[in-house]
Curated annotation (Swiss-Prot):
Core component of nucleosome which plays a central role in DNA double strand break (DSB) repair. Nucleosomes wrap and compact DNA into chromatin, limiting DNA accessibility to the cellular machineries which require DNA as a template. Histones thereby play a central role in transcription regulation, DNA repair, DNA replication and chromosomal stability. DNA accessibility is regulated via a complex set of post-translational modifications of histones, also called histone code, and nucleosome remodeling. This is Histone H2A.z. The gene is H2AZ. GO terms for cellular component: nucleosome; nucleus. Its main location: nucleus. Belongs to the histone H2A family.
Length: 143
């Protein structure tokens, strides 16, 4: 064999690199999160395990929010037929209905186009008052 044939065989035997996300069994990009963490940490020394852990947490939170949002869309599609898109309104309602996510996101986040949570204060609701005096009963009946 010539030298060029042996080097070409060595190149063909080279194993393709496997992404860190695949090794960890995640969808979120571990390598990108690792790079971003290294840019933010002053000493530039970050363990790859911390990146895997952070990617797993972010993936879990994203899946939780998406699951709750899909349930909001299905609830609204029963009221209004053929709702097939997730809107900022659905996202807001999903986050506000879950107590833990609401506590996590409440302080620093505003969802553009989300609107407000439907709520009517008890004072503003119409309540029939019972008349206390007999004269009030007569005036109400006469009207």
């Amino acid at each position: 064999m010539t030298e060029s044939e042996t080097t070409s065989k060595k190149v063909n035997k080279r194993v393709k690199p496997v992404p860190k996300s695949t090794k960890a069994g995640l969808i979120f990009p571990v390598g990108r999160i690792h790079r971003m963490l290294k840019n933010k940490v002053p000493l530039k020394r970050v363990s790859i395990l911390s990146s895997v852990y952070l990617a797993a947490i972010l993936e879990y939170l994203a899946s939780e929010v998406l699951e709750l949002t899909i349930s909001q869309v299905s609830i609204q599609s029963k009221e209004y037929h053929n709702v097939r898109r997730i809107s900022p309104r659905h996202l807001l309602l999903a986050i506000k209905t879950d107590e833990e996510l609401d506590n996590l996101i409440r302080v620093s986040t505003t969802i553009a186009g989300g609107g407000v949570i439907p709520y009517i204060h008890e004072v503003l609701k119409k309540v029939e008052q019972k008349p206390t005096h007999p004269q009030q009963k007569q005036t109400i009946k006469s009207i």
